[in-house]
Swiss-Prot record:
ATP-dependent serine protease that mediates the selective degradation of mutant and abnormal proteins as well as certain short-lived regulatory proteins. Required for cellular homeostasis and for survival from DNA damage and developmental changes induced by stress. Degrades polypeptides processively to yield small peptide fragments that are 5 to 10 amino acids long. Binds to DNA in a double-stranded, site-specific manner. Coiled coil: none annotated. Homohexamer. Organized in a ring with a central cavity. This is Lon protease 2. ATP binds at residues 97-104. CDD domains: AAA, HLD_clamp_RarA. Residues 349-535 form the Lon proteolytic domain. It catalyses: Hydrolysis of proteins in presence of ATP. NCBIfam families: spore_lonB (TIGR02902). It comes from Bacillus subtilis (strain 168).
Amino acid sequence: MSWTGIALFIQLFFGIIIGLYFWNLLKNQRTQKVTIDKESKKEMEQLRKMRAISLSEPLSEKVRPKSFKDIVGQEDGIKALKAALCGPNPQHVIVYGPPGVGKTAAARLVLEEAKKHKQSPFKEQAVFVELDATTARFDERGIADPLIGSVHDPIYQGAGAMGQAGIPQPKQGAVTHAHGGVLFIDEIGELHPIQMNKMLKVLEDRKVFLDSAYYSEENTQIPNHIHDIFQNGLPADFRLIGATTRMPNEIPPAIRSRCLEVFFRELEKDELKTVAKTAADKIEKNISEEGLDLLTSYTRNGREAVNMIQIAAGMAVTENRKDITIEDIEWVIHSSQLTPKHEQKIGVEPQVGIVNGLAVYGPNSGSLLEIEVSVTAAQDKGSINITGIAEEESIGSQSKSIRRKSMAKGSVENVLTVLRTMGMKPSDYDIHINFPGGIPIDGPSAGIAMAAGIFSAIHKIPIDNTVAMTGEISLNGLVKPIGGVIPKIKAAKQSGAKKVIIPYENQQAILKQIDGIEIIAVKTFQEVLDEILVNPPTEQKPFHIEINKESV
């Protein structure tokens, strides 16, 4: 065989091998495609079957407010939301309030309301983007950030076309998706500090700037839109609505200073009845007034009321009944191991050493605070014992905090000084001040209440049980302003008080809108005594003691 024949044979041999190789590749590709198509058809069929199945609409969805009229008890909060977002220059907002009172529903509705106003910058296509801060996790390397956005560098892109070409791929975050609309962040107080700081920059610039080690302005392979994103940033002109169940002092000052703060309050008993009755009507069930009374004694917000109605209605359905009975409500209470809601009421009659103070808890909720004072003659040197208060408190931020003696305990020392200036000798007595209820009390606003209780206990003069009071007391007997005066007044009214004493400097025009209770503004502790002391059985008139104001 000649060399030419050998060369042709070798070429033919390798040609056959190469042909078999490519034929096998094509066969595998066809097999894979057929397999993928079969799998895709099976999955599509499964999806169609799943989409054909739907359960009934949950009761919580049925009773979700469709308009502002459906949100019960939050007229002031809704008014503030409209003022902040429905004008020509909408602002960022933080909404404080307990869970289940309508914060999210109000946020959804306020954007639709704003679209109706001609001056509003929100257009018809403005979007409402929701994000839960408790699940908004991010990667510190910048690979993923659902809030701000991220860049997928080629090393993380896998087999995509841009990854193989070495092109970084920007991914939009919620701040960009909300461009031209509203970004709602639920539980904004749980947002990671790094994300919070990034968002502050976005709120100022109204843009998101991304960077990548793989980006170069000189790279002509990078598409124009990616060049534009890296050079000019992603648009992020939106208005933020953050909702939280935390107190304002637990939110970073940097974000608070950029937002209008709106407060939603706890629902009152009658308002919870309205929510529960509406829920029962939606599922065509009847519930008696006694049943509503019992239900609202164990619920603290609208969501809990709806859930109880739904479970009780399930009991009625299984027994083919149209009515939700008291027995159904009692069964729900027992099976859910619910505890009754504490509802403090004023005393039945005036008593010595018993005074009605006022406290505020949560973002915008008040409560009546019964204070008990017992005084006995001391065997030797007198003592003072205080129970039911926080002994000390910690203030500051995550990076730095300081501990100090409880403000309530410090207020007691102010009270003793005032009583000494009035000619009394607290050191001659063993004084016990008790704040019942099991919840540690802190703050100086119970100052005048404690002073009144000690004065009453020493002189054996009863205190009017229909009067509640709040105010800090200074060393010279002046009544100083306090916070949370509106929820405190409303709490006094709900507890059955006929009068409420507040510091003179807390007078506001809006207080005139609160009906059903007399509001008395005082400047000195002597004025407090004039309003609260009741004549003892001997018809002895309460005496006046001048306060030494020259010690100021």
